């Protein structure tokens, strides 16, 4: 009705079609000049009905006109009369009517509830019940897993969850046979089901031995995917007879190995899998299904629990080789070695889709830290294959329930999962949930969440909880987990709830602290026995289980497998050849200089920025200066030295991967390897990376601004470098002080990985280090800790002090076929210190210097008069040179030790011999006496001194904190240590 009455009313508000404008001149206001024009417009706005502010007034006039045409002024009446001859908006000739009576009519009807739907009370009741049924369905999807039959020990009753009962929604027994719409479920092709059938279907699907959490996922497509998988099958696996026999075979192998080791090697640690044998069936299914889907490599990370079982029954390690390790007859070729349950292993196995390479990562006892290492290894393999989505490489991480919930590195690793620089296309997580962490089994002490898996909800990973005593449900859960990962490229978690038959290790007595749990365990017949009895009841043979067990035991007695799963003659074209890097020495020569013509060509390429890129003025200045440096017009600074090292390497075929919290720009804005267009209109576009445009066939250059994590990111890069010796992999700390946030990675992998496991790794660490008054958290990369870890030529520790030195040491890391971790203590103030710049000759006609000798020509000329030699490392050198100049001394020589480990004995000895009459050698450092290099270099310096020379120390006093927080105190300390370097020796000295 209102629409009809508005037929011409719209015309009142329609703008007049433009045409010749006639200005009606108000009396007494001449229209002349700009001022007059403005006054006219003001008059026009206040009088014109076209002005929006007058619309309510015009509407009111029009209402009055429709009610009584004579009630409005003549000029308005004439206008409204003419308006009635204009066709309505819908083209009809209907006449407008007043709105006011119509509006009032609607108001009265609303008061009288005249619009209420006329429906029977019976219809309303049915509709309400349908809504309640939908609520019940939603409740099972959300909460069903909490009522699932998941605990093999059945230690507690199922919790009471009112929302899963029909009565919670007002539904009673009388409603059970009423049919309701089931259109939003996948239980049946029928559109309707009785409430009884719906309830049974919900309980079968969500509350059996498999409980799935997926409703926390925000993407509707993924939720529907899970609903369809679960509801269409009622979560019930369908296995053929042969598949069931194969599952029993895997359970038999898992239990058989543990029983064999338990009786043959009594009391020896092996961290038994007993109670969690379904895990081996899960791994077997995962590998076979992954191979069928085109996966060609699976990288596995896991802790000690069940590891020996995986080595033998999953990866195909020969039982006799494992027994040799127990018997201590296995070859011991490594300097240190490691226990058997930390060992890694690689093999190639047959699957329906072809050979699959399996790799179990070496790992320490520090739980979960191997996870980001595995992810890094996977990313390296993906990059090598050009596998952008993770179609060919699959990461599989195996966790314990207590560690998964308790170790913070898991949160950091999950945070990497969907980022551009670290994504691996989704990880399959399997949790051996034996419901106990060492001696802790009370959930009130284990964690602060309902499930150990709750941390993954932050990345919206689905979780499948499954009863380990139902191996067929475990197999089904594995299939769905893999399908989800391959479909959506996201993490997925399979939580296998089982138990730990023995103690934490075989020397432990768990009933001391878990008497109730271990009474239950003592009464449990074992998963293999339960499943064998189930198959026997299905008519698959009463003696099937016993026959399999005897056959497996017999094979172990002979040190072999019942079926050899390993392909011995398969060689993937993507396998890495480490032979060129074996047996190398750190003293091997490396030509790191580049020809001048090549220098200029590369410099021009990395400083030629497209005109379409609108650079920030400060960044433009940096690149203009770099262009001048490339031409030899300016001395080369640190940022240019880095860039030229990178450019020369990628142009020679060495990929570069650099990551850190501010690596693109550099913490101290010296790098600018990523140029941001200042006029870009999209946040995800408008960057330009000059080092990606060095040559047409160059190797990749990737710089990543990482998430705010040290531990997981450094471990990831270690894993990457350990799988790709041809790539220069760099991790840069924002400040070196924060590197100890990843101390576990440094201690357990970087420092000791080679002597424990024989794993070489060329990872480079850049740790900004230097005492410049920024306090205890922004001064020290803890040089002393790396010096303490240095042994067996396990790493290289370098503190370069010039642009040329950083250029050569970065190139040396790749050009020389030695893959050892390189720890660079990089500067802060030296990044812009002109004294730290270098000439072109330093790049084109020189190399890396482990020790930089005296450079002052006057001191060198008067070498015989030198009485004191000051040795140092790092930026303190420039403070010492400045002080010597102030004092006008020519009898003091200053040496820089650029490489602190491996210590350059021959070079230092040669430098000291240049000053035969020196009686004193002083080690000067910025760091406190108990920190820095002093305690680790004094014996090396002493070894190379001349007879009769005394060695002393000049530096800060021992301190519990790396640096002071008071600026004035820092200055006082710095002045004192520089003065001490030139003053009388005090305190402890060593005489040769």
Model-derived features: where do they sit?
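Thiamine diphosphate
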Residues: 40-43, 50-51, 424-543, 547, ...
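Subset of Sec-pathway N-terminal targeting signals
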Residues: 42-83, 87
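Extended, charge-enriched "interface" segments that sit outside catalytic cores
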Residues: 83-279, 295
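Conserved phosphate/anionic-ligand binding catalytic regions in large, soluble enzymes, centered on
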Residues: 136-152, 285-314, 399-419, 489, ...
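Glycine/aspartate-rich loop-and-adjacent alpha/beta segment that forms the canonical ThDP
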Residues: 140-143, 147-180, 184-192, 196, ...
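Active-site cores of enzymes that catalyze phosphoryl transfer or operate on phosphate-rich substrates
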Residues: 235-257, 323-375, 379-386, 817-886
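Cofactor-binding active-site loop characterized by glycine-rich and histidine/acidic residues
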Residues: 296-460, 464, 668-724
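Hard-cation-handling environments
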Residues: 527-528, 534, 538, 542-656, ...
């Amino acid at each position: 009705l209102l629409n009809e009455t508005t037929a011409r009313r719209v015309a009142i508000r329609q703008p007049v079609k433009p045409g010749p404008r006639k200005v009606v001149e108000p009396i007494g206001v001449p229209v002349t000049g700009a001022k007059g024009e403005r006054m006219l417009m003001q008059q026009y706005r206040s009088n014109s009905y076209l002005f929006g502010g007058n619309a309510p007034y015009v509407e009111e006039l029009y209402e009055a006109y429709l009610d009584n045409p004579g009630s409005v002024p003549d000029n308005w009446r004439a206008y409204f009369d003419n308006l009635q001859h204009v066709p309505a908006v819908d083209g009809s000739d209907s006449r407008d009517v007043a709105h006011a009576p119509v509006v009032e009519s609607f108001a009265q009807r609303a008061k009288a509830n005249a619009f209420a739907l006329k429906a029977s009370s019976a219809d309303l009741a049915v509709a309400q019940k349908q809504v309640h049924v939908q609520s019940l369905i939603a409740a099972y999807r959300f909460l069903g897993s909490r009522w699932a039959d998941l605990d093999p020990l059945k230690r507690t009753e199922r919790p009471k969850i009112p929302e899963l009962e029909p009565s919670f929604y007002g539904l009673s027994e009388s409603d059970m046979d009423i049919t309701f719409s089931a259109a939003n479920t996948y239980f049946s092709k029928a559109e309707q089901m009785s409430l009884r059938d719906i309830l049974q279907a919900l309980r079968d699907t969500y509350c059996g031995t498999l409980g799935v959490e997926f409703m926390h996922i925000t993407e509707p497509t993924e939720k529907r995917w899970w609903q369809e998988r679960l509801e269409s099958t009622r979560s019930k696996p369908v296995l053929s007879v042969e598949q069931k026999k194969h599952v029993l075979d895997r359970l038999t192998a898992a239990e058989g190995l543990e029983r064999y080791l338990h009786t043959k090697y009594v009391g020896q640690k092996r961290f038994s899998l007993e109670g969690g044998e379904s895990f081996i069936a899960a791994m077997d299914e995962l590998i076979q299904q992954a191979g069928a889907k085109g996966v060609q490599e699976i990288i596995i990370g896991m802790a000690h629990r069940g590891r020996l079982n995986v080595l033998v029954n999953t990866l195909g390690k020969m039982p006799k080789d494992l027994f040799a390790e127990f018997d201590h007859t296995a070859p011991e070729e490594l300097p240190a070695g490691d226990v058997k349950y930390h060992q890694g292993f690689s093999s190639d196995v047959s699957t329906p889709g072809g050979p699959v390479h399996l790799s179990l990562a070496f790992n320490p006892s520090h739980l979960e830290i191997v996870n980001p290492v595995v992810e890094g290894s996977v990313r390296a393999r993906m990059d090598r294959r050009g596998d952008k989505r993770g179609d060919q490489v699959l990461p599989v991480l195996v966790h314990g329930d207590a560690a998964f919930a308790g170790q913070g590195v898991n949160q950091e690793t999950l945070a990497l999962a969907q980022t551009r620089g670290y994504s691996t296309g989704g990880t399959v997580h399997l949790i051996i949930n034996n419901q106990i962490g060492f001696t802790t089994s009370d959930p009130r002490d284990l964690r602060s969440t309902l499930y150990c898996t709750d941390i993954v909800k932050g990345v919206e990973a689905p979780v499948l909880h499954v009863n380990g005593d139902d191996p067929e449900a475990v197999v089904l859960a594995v299939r769905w987990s893999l399908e989800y990962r391959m479909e959506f490229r996201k993490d997925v978690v399979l939580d296998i709830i089982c138990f730990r038959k023995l103690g934490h290790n075989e020397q432990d007595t768990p009933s001391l602290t878990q008497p109730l749990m271990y009474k239950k365990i003592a009464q449990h017949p074992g998963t293999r026995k339960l499943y064998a009895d189930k198959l026997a009841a299905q008519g698959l043979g009463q003696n099937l289980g016993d026959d399999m067990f005897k056959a497996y035991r017999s094979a172990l007695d002979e040190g072999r497998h019942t079926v050899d799963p390993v392909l011995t003659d398969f060689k993937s074209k993507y396998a890495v050849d480490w032979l060129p890097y074996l047996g190398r020495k750190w003293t091997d020569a490396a030509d790191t200089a580049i020809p001048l013509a090549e220098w200029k060509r590369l410099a021009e390429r990395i400083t030629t920025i497209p005109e379409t890129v609108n650079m920030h003025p400060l960044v433009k200045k940096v690149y203009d200066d770099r262009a001048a440096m490339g031409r030899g017009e300016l001395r080369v600074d640190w940022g240019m030295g880095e860039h030229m090292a990178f450019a020369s390497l990628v142009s020679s075929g060495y990929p570069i991967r650099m990551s850190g919290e501010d690596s693109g720009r550099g913490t101290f804005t010296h790098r600018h390897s990523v140029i941001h267009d200042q006029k870009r209109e999209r946040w995800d576009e408008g960057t330009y990376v000059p080092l990606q445009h060095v040559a047409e066939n160059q190797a990749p250059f990737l710089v990543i601004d990482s998430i705010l994590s040290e531990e997981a990111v450094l471990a990831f890069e270690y894993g990457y470098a350990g799988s790709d010796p041809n790539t220069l992999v760099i991790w840069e700390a924002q400040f070196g002080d924060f590197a100890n946030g990843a101390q576990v990675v440094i201690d357990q992998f970087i420092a000791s990985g080679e002597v424990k496991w024989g794993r070489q790794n060329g990872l480079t660490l850049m740790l900004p280090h230097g005492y410049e008054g920024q306090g205890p958290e922004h001064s020290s990369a803890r040089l002393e800790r790396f010096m303490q870890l240095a042994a067996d030529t396990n790493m290289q520790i370098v503190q370069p002090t010039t642009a040329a030195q950083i250029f050569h040491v970065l190139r040396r890391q790749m050009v020389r076929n030695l893959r050892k971790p390189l720890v660079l203590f990089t500067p802060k103030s030296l990044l812009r210190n002109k004294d730290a710049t270098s000439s072109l000759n330093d790049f084109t006609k020189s190399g890396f210097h482990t020790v930089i000798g005296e450079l002052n020509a006057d001191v060198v000329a008067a070498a015989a008069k030198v009485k004191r030699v000051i040795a140092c490392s790092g930026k303190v050198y420039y403070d010492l040179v400045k002080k010597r100049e102030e004092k006008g001394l020519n009898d003091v020589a200053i040496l820089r030790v650029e490489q602190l480990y491996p210590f350059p004995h021959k070079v230092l000895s040669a430098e000291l011999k240049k000053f035969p009459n020196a009686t004193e050698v002083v080690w000067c450092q910025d760091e406190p006496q108990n920190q820095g290099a002093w305690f680790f270099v004094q014996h090396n310096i002493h070894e190379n001194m001349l007879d009769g020379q005394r060695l002393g120390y000049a530096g800060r006093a021992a301190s519990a904190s790396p640096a002071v927080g008071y600026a004035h105190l820092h200055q006082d300390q710095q002045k004192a240590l520089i003065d001490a370097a030139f003053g009388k020796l005090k305190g402890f000295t060593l005489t040769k």
